[in-house]
């Protein structure tokens, strides 16, 4: 089976060590493991490093079953902004030009959405050639654009972004099948596009492979954390990720002022890091160690009592299961999050953490875990069990590969 994958904004096999594999790399690896060949289309610009892998179109033959094709674009310096939209438009334009010269079509394609523009260009090209397409929807673009505006401005914003709404609905309807990370998310996408669900529309959880961290790695990580003053002598809760506008760190500041004996370890970087540091001024129990690698994350989890998933309650997360939730389950830690909807249901029904709010502050949830060691351990066990049942990497991606194989069989 010849498979095309289109996914920008994720790490690639050519990016070197220390990268966290996401949908594109994970699916590529599983397909190759199953004996299939993959052409992975992506951007020549790295979303993670904000650097160009190449300034022009390049093709990289990784092995006999994997080729990576890099589409050039202008790039951008911030996660959110006009430059990113311009980059995506240029990316789609260049992809369209490359496809005009393409002579070989795949048996099936798996297209990441967003970006809207590249997904639209490739799905249209494939539809004309009667190639089945699975559209993997991971974010609620362009609705997220409108949500970023004050409510009074949202009707105007919806008019401004109308072309994106038109293009996204057309692309979703053109797809042979949809995939999403949570049932509520899939239903939202179908409602948004006014599309009936079909037998090929499926939920495939966003998850990552385990392993790869050795005892030596953990030993080195422990020494590094000792230097940072994080050794587990005091209870620890932590956040790992990019400091972005989609997170609300104010509840952490309030909890840190109240719980002076707790260490709040906030790891990562991003556009909003400076603002978060200003919010935490004078709080010696809040630690910013910067970006950390996998061994440091795993050791930090071993000495922590809970993981923080401080998402704002916006539609994109209310109907979804964001990666910070999955990460906590993988690490076997109780989840502390304000998210309603899909995540709140998951937390309550599986007893894997707490949903904090103005009525049930974050600090109270943390104090409860400290005072109830048996409950903390039980929630940790529940988290591991839930991960194994619903988010296990091999189960998810073996199922996804089988799904693609069956779709191709049914087309022939």
What are the roles of these predicted feature ranges?
Residues 368, 375-390:
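A short, well-ordered alpha-helix in the C-terminal region of glycosyltransferases
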Residues 349-360, 368-374:
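Conserved acidic donor-binding segment of nucleotide-sugar-dependent glycosyltransferases
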Residues 210, 225-247, 253-256, 265:
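Conserved donor-binding/catalytic core segment of Leloir-type glycosyltransferases
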Residues 93, 100, 117-120, 124-128, ...:
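Membrane-proximal helix-turn-helix segments that form the acceptor-binding/catalytic region
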Residues 1-60, 177, 209, 254-257:
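N-terminal subdomain of nucleotide-sugar transferases
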Residues 165-201, 210-213, 345, 400:
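A short, active-site helix/loop in glycosyltransferases that binds the activated sugar's phosphate group
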